[in-house]
Structure formats: structure tokens, C-alpha cells
């Protein structure tokens, strides 16, 4: 797969609306600001990333505190293992008011919401941001979420994706119920809209029956941008059908290259152009004014800030499996992977990176020591070298940058790394488009 010399990478900020980033020790970092319950905190993050010309910032979400480990939320609450998760529609509205160009994405579950609710939420966001909305499609991961939404247990892995396919069919159908020129707004004739250009959907599936039409007209982007992060075989097929930006968790470049090729092939098999779908691995950047400073910061992240129990709390949440009674030296077998209903692909990718023999301690270390994606360490020039190797080596189309602390990690990326990427012609120095789709180079449906 050859690349144009003028091709530039995409950069996306991976955000959390709570007290910790995805790195569970981040709240203990000496530079972390504990202002996650203040609107100014999120608005500042939006301004920082927009100043760095990031394509988008999107927020992860879950519908429950981590409570699988030991059958209690106590460890998550005590150790700060992501117990706080604010309502993202409110957070994005606050950021939208102080930014003009950066894309704004939120995570909504196809298992615990309805198509009409999600379609209306993101259509509204797309209008009120001038075409900057994106939906990160997830199927949710565990029983704790089910129990907050009126169910006893979470759907099994494949059933969640069957439901998600119908959810997307209905949601996309609702976005298409208004034609682009349906609004007339003719004061003289008294004609608000053309009823021949507003259509009922009448979706009738196994999981959903949705009449429509949507109560929000066609949006500036036509449809909000769709993100997805499935990495199991079923998840990759789902992404091949629906996703426009695929968020991956590949820990090493060889795993990433294999994933990139496999996913692009699946996209082509769906009759879609692989060039219109971007694959972005989550990456941590540990930046310093010198290599030695960056390595000392990395040592602190690896050795000082993460409680091993917090890692097991988050691992239990992701896998929907209580690991509190297992020893760290116990093997992670094929049978164990098949028995869980949570995120299987994450474990499979890590096993491919480390080797077939994988223990629970390896997985706990994976969550604790920042191995969910690549970890780029060094000066701005050195980190740019590492990112360029991935980007030019058929491993990705850009990166989703996760923070080791906030907001400082993003401030450092914008100050130390982005100018290097811009000088090399690898990243934009201004926004040329007026919508998120235009800035990502994606077609308007």
C-alpha cells in the first residue's frame, strides 16, 4: 500500500469526563489538575487541542462504575479507577461554545440506548457545532452497565453486535429521513418544509422497530462521523461495514501492520473504499525537553503511580470477569478468553505482541504500564520519528493520543510534538475544512 508524499496523519484526543484519564494512575500525577467537575477544565482542553489543529477530541464513556472486581465498586472508588463519568452531551456543548473547528465526539452504547435518542442527540450536536459531531459506537462491556439499565446481565458478545447492526441501520436511516433541501422557510407562502422530502423510516427489525422521521433536519455533515473500536473478528466486520474512523489498541508495530491490512481488506469486501476509512491506534506520548527527562517521566508512570489492584479493577470491567480470586501467575487460556463477554480483541492483540503464553499478571501489567497502544518516549523530534515509522510503514493513518496526565500531557503534545510534525509536512498547520468530515478528508453521504 503506497502513500502519497503529501498525505498527512490525523490526530485525535482521547478524553475522559471524570477524575482520571484512561491511564488509571493519572489522577496521582503531580501535574494533574483536579478540576474535572468544572466547566472551564473541559473548555481549556478544547482550546488547547484546537490550537494544535487536532482533527477531533472524543470522550470515552461507560454507564456504570467498575464493580465487577470482587463484586463491589469499593476498590474503584477508593483507588480512583475511573469511578466518575459525566454526561457527555453536556460536556460537548460546553466545549462547542468556545471552539470553532475541532471535531467533538462522544461514546454512546447501542445496547442501552435507543436509535431515535442517539440519532437526535448527534444530529442536534452536528447542527449546533456547524458540522463537527462524531459518534463513537460501542456495545458496552459488562454486567454493571446492564444492571444500571434495567437488566440483570449483559448480552453476549455476538448478540451485542447483531443488535448493533440493527441499531446503526435504524439510526442512519433516521438521519436520512430529511433530504438536504427539505426546509423551505417561506414566510410569504407559510410553507415551513416540503413534506415530500421528509420521509417515514418504518424500520422493522428483530431488535428495533422505528417509525420516524427524525425531528431534526438533515445535518451539515449529512451524517455525523462514525467511530468504532471493535478488534475481535466480529468487531472488525462491524467496523468494516459502518466505521469511518477505527480506533485500535495495537501494542506493537507488527501487530498494527497485520491489523491494518486485515481491516482494510474487510472494508473492501464490504464494497467500500478503504481509503475513506482511517485507522488510528491509541498512543501514549511521554515527552521531555531531553531524552533523559522523558525516560525519568516514563519511569514514574511505570513504577510510582499505578496501584496493581486498580489495574485488575479495570481489567475486570473490560473483560466482564471477576479476577479478584485469581493469582497473577495464572495463565490466560483460550477457554478463558472465550468465556468472557467483554473486550476479547484487546487480549488477543496483546498476546500476539507478547507471545502465546500470557498470564493474568501480564494483563494487569498491560493496563498498568501503558501497553494498550504504542508508547512513544523522548523529545519532540524523537517521538515524531517513532510516529512517522508507524505512519509511513502501513501501520496506521494517524493516532488517538491518550493522556498520562491532564491537561498537561496535551499541552506538551501541542508545544513539543505538533510543531515537529508540521515542519515535516506530516500534519496540518491550519484547518482547511468547515466540517469534521472535510478536515478528515471523508466524503459527505
Question: What are these regions, as identified by a protein language model?
Answer:
Residues 1-445:
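N-terminal glycine-rich cofactor-binding segment that shapes the pocket for flavin-like pterin cofactors
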Amino acid at each position: 500500500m503506497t502513500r502519497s508524499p503529501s498525505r498527512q496523519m490525523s490526530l485525535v484526543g482521547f478524553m475522559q469526563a471524570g477524575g482520571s484519564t484512561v491511564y488509571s494512575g493519572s489522577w496521582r500525577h503531580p501535574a494533574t489538575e483536579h478540576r474535572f467537575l468544572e466547566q472551564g477544565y473541559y473548555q481549556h482542553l478544547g482550546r488547547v487541542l484546537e490550537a494544535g489543529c487536532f482533527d477531533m477530541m472524543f470522550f470515552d464513556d461507560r454507564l456504570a462504575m467498575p464493580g465487577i472486581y470482587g463484586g463491589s465498586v469499593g476498590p474503584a472508588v477508593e483507588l480512583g479507577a475511573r469511578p466518575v463519568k459525566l454526561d457527555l452531551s453536556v460536556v460537548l456543548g460546553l466545549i462547542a461554545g468556545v471552539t470553532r473547528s475541532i471535531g467533538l465526539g462522544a461514546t454512546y452504547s447501542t445496547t442501552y440506548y435507543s436509535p431515535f435518542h442517539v440519532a437526535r442527540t448527534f444530529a442536534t450536536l452536528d447542527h449546533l457545532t456547524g458540522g463537527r459531531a462524531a459518534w463513537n459506537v460501542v456495545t458496552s462491556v459488562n454486567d454493571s452497565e446492564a444492571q444500571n439499565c434495567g437488566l440483570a446481565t449483559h448480552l453476549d458478545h455476538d448478540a451485542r453486535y447483531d443488535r448493533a447492526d440493527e441499531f446503526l441501520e435504524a439510526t442512519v436511516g433516521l438521519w436520512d429521513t430529511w433530504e438536504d433541501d427539505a426546509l423551505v422557510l417561506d414566510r410569504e407562502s407559510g410553507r415551513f418544509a416540503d413534506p415530500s422530502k421528509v420521509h417515514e423510516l418504518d424500520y422493522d427489525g428483530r431488535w428495533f422497530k422505528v417509525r420516524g422521521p427524525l425531528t431534526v433536519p438533515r445535518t451539515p455533515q449529512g451524517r455525523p462521523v462514525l467511530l468504532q473500536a471493535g478488534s475481535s473478528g466480529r468487531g472488525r466486520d462491524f467496523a468494516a461495514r459502518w466505521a469511518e474512523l477505527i480506533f485500535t489498541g495495537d501494542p506493537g508495530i507488527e501487530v498494527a501492520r497485520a491489523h491494518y491490512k486485515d481491516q482494510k481488506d474487510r472494508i473492501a469486501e464490504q464494497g467500500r473504499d478503504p481509503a475513506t476509512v482511517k485507522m488510528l491506534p491509541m498512543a501514549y506520548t511521554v515527552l521531555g525537553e531531553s531524552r533523559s527527562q522523558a525516560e525519568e517521566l516514563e519511569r514514574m508512570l511505570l513504577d510510582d503511580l499505578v496501584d496493581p489492584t486498580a489495574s485488575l479493577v479495570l481489567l475486570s470491567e473490560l473483560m466482564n470477569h471477576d479476577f479478584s480470586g485469581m493469582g497473577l501467575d495464572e495463565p490466560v487460556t483460550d477457554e478463558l478468553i472465550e468465556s468472557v463477554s467483554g473486550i476479547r480483541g484487546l487480549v488477543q492483540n496483546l498476546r500476539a505482541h507478547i507471545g502465546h503464553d500470557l498470564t493474568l499478571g501480564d494483563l494487569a501489567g498491560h493496563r498498568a504500564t501503558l501497553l494498550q497502544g504504542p508508547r512513544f518516549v523522548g523529545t519532540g523530534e524523537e517521538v515524531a520519528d517513532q510516529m512517522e515509522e508507524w505512519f509511513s510503514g502501513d501501520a496506521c493513518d494517524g493516532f488517538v493520543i491518550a493522556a498520562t496526565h491532564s491537561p498537561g500531557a496535551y499541552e506538551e503534545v501541542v508545544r513539543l510534538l505538533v510543531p515537529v510534525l508540521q515542519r515535516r509536512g506530516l500534519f496540518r498547520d491550519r484547518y482547511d475544512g468547515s466540517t469534521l468530515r472535510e478536515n478528515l478528508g471523508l466524503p459527505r453521504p
